[in-house]
UniProtKB/Swiss-Prot annotation:
It is an enzyme of class 2 (transferase). Belongs to the acetokinase family. It comes from Listeria monocytogenes serovar 1/2a (strain ATCC BAA-679 / EGD-e). ATP binds at K15, H206, L207, G208, N209, G210, D281, F282, R283, G329, V330, G331, E332, N333. InterPro entries: Ac/propionate_kinase (IPR004372), Aliphatic_acid_kin_short-chain (IPR000890), Aliphatic_acid_kinase_CS (IPR023865), ATPase_NBD (IPR043129). This is Acetate kinase 2.
Amino acid sequence: MHKIMAINAGSSSLKFQIFTMPGEEVLVKGLIERIGLPDAIFNMSFQNEKIKETRAINDHGKAVEILLEQLKAHQVINDLSEITGVGHRVAHGGEDFVTSCVVTDEVVKGIEAVTNLAPLHNPANIIGIKTFRELLPNAVSVAVFDTAFHQTIPQENFLYALPYELYEKHHIRKYGFHGTSHKYVAGKAAEVLEKPLEKLKIISCHLGNGASVCAIEAGKSVNTSMGFTPNAGLMMGTRSGTIDATIIPYLVDELGYSLDEVMHMMSNESGVLGVSGISSDFRDIEIAAKEGNSRALLTLRMFTGQICNYIGAYASAMNGCDALLFTAGVGENSPLIRQMVTEQLSYLGVTCHVTKNNAGDMIISNDNEAVKVCIIPTNEELMIARDVEKYAKQTIG
């Protein structure tokens, strides 16, 4: 038995879990928020105990130091050497990283080389990697790429209809994201349905503040809604999703926005927040919709309609669908969103049992339907830990 830590470093946050492997038991989990501010928040829960502290945490390096100190202070671990591996979620691996890998100096350079493809995500991921390598030098560090699962997407599905040399010389193409989540829920669905993953055609809907749809055939990603960046595809909490590209120069040339202002608008002021004018949180939107707010209702119709467009396209491309999956914060917790999606898909043989849906059952389609509709809670941290364990075993025997 050994202890594996899964890390998800954001620009001002650090999410963590420690698993005992191979039993996959969660030993501790937590979140450090508002890093860089004097009132940063440290959250940690283990056994029946929860800790929440507000304190100054200047940077990610200090956050990691405090985390390791707290783990020892509360006897979650007695010595840092007990942590045999650390897995890091990395948003973008470009075309070079097609699978998880042990972190070396060369790997760090490779991740840094594609930072321009994920400027909001990769820099924080790199800070997390460097800090843990410094403070836990004997632990195996593994990078787990959100883009890796989508490297099986065929060229006709990942290329943009731009001059081909832009792909050859500059690697401009669809990469896709949420790969770790889509991979996990597909495998879990196969277990739930008691069918071989290799025999299933699955459409996975990862619906949270970020959202994407993925077509999975025989356990491999064959298409996904996100693209060159995580801003493409569905409208999201604050992201516009895919729009007509010529809107951007129109905003700049005709309406006087700077390019930076447009990009900030598309990433931080659009999507659910932009359309509703209320919030980026679907819980707030659903409350407003029930109260009759027309823009909240419009937001729900737009979001679910876009999801259905992708589902229909992917079911057609795969010549069928055996399972439709809902996962992540909205997908797992919003009966209304699931209902609005499924009621538009009757032509595919999709059904939604009202009682099962409202109860959050794992299978919410009517009995004996060909297309199984499932709620599968995602567990990206466990997927990261599993990847780390493979490499840790090779190192520690």
